[in-house]
Amino acid sequence: MATCLRGITKRVNLLQRRVYPSCGHLIRDDRDETKSGSSDTMIREVLARNGTNKLSSMFADRHYQSFATGPLGLGLSSCRHMSSTPPEWSDKVDGIDFVATEVVPDEIIEAVTTTSQAVVPAINEVAIAAADSAFPVAALQHLIDAVHSFTGLNWWASIALTTVLIRGVTIPILLNQLKATYKLNVLRPQLEELRQEMSTKAQDPEAMAEGQRRMQLLFKEHGVTPFTPLKGLIIQGPIFISFFFAIRNMAEKVPSFKTGGTLWFTDLTTTDTTYILPLLTAVTFLIMVESNMQEGLEGNPVAGTMKKFSRIIAFLSIPVLIGIEKALFCYWLTSNLFTLVYGLTLRRPDVRKLLNLPDVVNSSTRQPSPSSPLPFSFAEPKDQSVVAQEKPPMSSESSSSVPDRRISRSSVLNQRIRTLERQLKDRKIKK
């Protein structure tokens, strides 16, 4: 009998070992720290925590513990492993921050933060400033920013360098304008003759049409138009306006302009309280007028008016320039200096020969030089060589002013007599 009981006990133990692992997940404990003890002790703790359940209380009794730890583990199937007591390590977890301090060092976090704060505004500030601008103004702002980023220069030097680049691109167009102006001045005597003939035949529509046709042929033959002197205004006008609005917009909306200057004009967003930049701009403009505009204007009927008007503008512009931001002077002053260098360079004979410009003729009083067209000149200056070609050489007997007037009057009378003779011949032929 004892042998049979012993065999049954072994079989029950084997069956319990086979079935019990399948129920092990019901009492899993994922904590890092596990308490040592047998499975019976763990089951008792579970049953004690769920003592409110009647069935659990039943299994908590000593008489039913053997049934709970039986081979099929029926006691475990009727209770839940739900504890209201928080784990021991829960008070150590306040958030996710403890992981970041271990994974990412503080030095890297500070470096990324400072880099994002310093680099991102520098990249986006010009784009934000140019967002609400017109296309030419926005394009010019991006060009200044590209020069600033590529060269690493301060804003004042970037504006000056961009001015030189833009003015350098317009040099071929200005040279073409200068050559066309010379050709137009050579045609001026012929055009004046045609105008006189047309004025005498103002009542004859056919004669007026013929005169206009001959003028068009002359313009086409020499490749010029009456609007040739306006090329400088058409080109330089939009450039000046675009620079003005672009730089002023950047001075208002780009924060780095506050430290983008040098010397006494470090802050480019404010006016110059020392009045040095406004005075320099006005003086360079006046020098530009005296050295470039006065040359070759002797034959132009509006030469005196233009020169006086430019002088007045040079003096009246000082109060206006005082209220302008310093950043604008980086363009304005550079543009004036560029025009001066451009005019002085064209005075050299070797440069004129290289550019295929007409030679300068020496005068009795001084040696004239080629005119340098200014950005906003409504009348293009004439070169003295063209004036010398227009006017025939005067003899020594006609050096005084009275013989000059007599010769001019006699030439006009002869011209009128010839036109009257032609009209009489035309009438006889028609009859």
From Swiss-Prot:
Function noted in UniProt: Probably required for the insertion of integral membrane proteins into the mitochondrial inner membrane. May participate in the activity and assembly of cytochrome oxidase.
Organism whose genome encodes this protein: Arabidopsis thaliana
NCBIfam families, sorted: yidC_oxa1_cterm
Disulfide partners: none
An example Gene Ontology CC term for this record: mitochondrial inner membrane
Cited PANTHER family: MITOCHONDRIAL INNER MEMBRANE PROTEIN OXA1-LIKE, OXA1
A Pfam short name: 60KD_IMP
UniProt GO MF annotations: membrane insertase activity
InterPro entries referenced in this protein's UniProt entry, alphabetically: YidC/ALB3/OXA1/COX18, YidC/Oxa/ALB_C
Subcellular location, record wording: Mitochondrion inner membrane
Recorded name of the encoding gene: OXA1L
Region called Disordered, residue ranges: 362-414
Membrane topology: Multi-pass membrane protein
Span of chain positions assigned to the transit peptide in the UniProt entry: 1-22
Family affiliation: Belongs to the OXA1/ALB3/YidC (TC 2.A.9.2) family.
TM region positions: 119-139, 155-175, 227-247, 269-289, 312-332
Biased amino acid composition, Low complexity: 392-402
Transmembrane is among the record's keywords: yes
Keywords for this protein: Membrane, Mitochondrion, Mitochondrion inner membrane, Transit peptide, Transmembrane, Transmembrane helix
Protein name: Mitochondrial inner membrane protein OXA1-like
